[in-house]
Amino acid sequence: MFCVVLVYNLSMDQQFCQNLKDSRKQAGLTQKQVAKYLNVVESCYANWEQGRTEPNIEMLRKLCFILNVCADDLING
């Protein structure tokens, strides 16, 4: 077993926001559905897609699982 430590300021890269939105749409999910799976309010998730706030590392891990992508795909495209 190995652990990858990811340190990155997501708010500095609008590419993350676009990748998150694209990945969600590719998964066929709405913002409301993703928010429900993450147990956050829809506006919280929408703020991530709009670059107003950023998910913490635990939420990023859950996003990757829900959207079936790796963190590198979300961050770097």
Task: List each language-model region with its residue ranges.
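Short amphipathic helical patch at the helix-1/turn junction of helix-turn-helix
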Residues: 14, 25-26, 40, 54
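Residues that mark the N-terminal boundary/hinge immediately upstream of a DNA-recognition element
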Residues: 19, 30, 56-59, 70
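DNA major-groove recognition helix of helix-turn-helix/homeodomain DNA-binding modules
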Residues: 39, 58-73
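A detector for short, charged/polar N-terminal pre-domain segments
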Residues: 1-15
